[in-house]
Amino acid sequence: MKVIFTQDVKGKGKKGEIKDVPVGYANNFLIKNNYAVEATPGNLKQLEQQNKRAEADRQKEIDDAKALKSKLEEIEVEVSAKTGEGGKLFGSVSTKQIAEALKTQHDIKIDKRKMDLPQGIHALGYTNVPVKLDKEVEGTIRVHTVEK
């Protein structure tokens, strides 16, 4: 019997997959527990529509990420930090501080965990910080570190 999985079933199939399974297993376990539905023409059409909708949503996410990337390339974020003698920073500028400055200065909200800055910024001046906006889209934020 052909079924369409509505949820992931370990060792059998993933959500949205169409598979041929034994009739008893399909009726007594998969369909009964709402893990799958029978692969009728109506259900197949519904699955196709869901896949198209999901693809359109995914494309919209990618387009939004690309728009944000182009916006980030045009702006500059200014972060102030305490410095000692010789222009050395006390501590470092973290991704949290950059995210907060981006939110207050340009009203753009980006999760600090999406920024790739493992060591932080330890010097005054300009730094390009890579940001993972989406699985496929990566941008950079230009950060200007100034004295407090």
Swiss-Prot record:
Function: Binds to the 23S rRNA.
Disulphide-bonded residues: none
SUPFAM superfamilies cross-referenced by the UniProt entry: L9 N-domain-like, Ribosomal protein L9 C-domain
InterPro entries in the record: Ribosomal_bL9, Ribosomal_bL9/RNase_H1_N, Ribosomal_bL9_bac/chp, Ribosomal_bL9_C, Ribosomal_bL9_C_sf, Ribosomal_bL9_N, Ribosomal_bL9_N_sf
Iron-sulfur is among the record's keywords: no
PROSITE patterns: RIBOSOMAL_L9 (PS00651)
Name of the protein described by the UniProt record: Large ribosomal subunit protein bL9
Entry's Gene Ontology molecular function annotations: rRNA binding; structural constituent of ribosome
Gene3D superfamilies from the UniProt entry: Ribosomal protein L9, C-terminal domain, Ribosomal protein L9, N-terminal domain
GO terms (BP aspect): translation
Cited NCBIfam families: L9
Keyword Ribosomal protein included in the entry's annotation: yes
Family: Belongs to the bacterial ribosomal protein bL9 family.
A GO-annotated cellular component: ribonucleoprotein complex
Lineage per the UniProt record: Bacteria, Bacillati, Bacillota, Bacilli, Bacillales
Keywords from the named record: Ribonucleoprotein, Ribosomal protein, RNA-binding, rRNA-binding
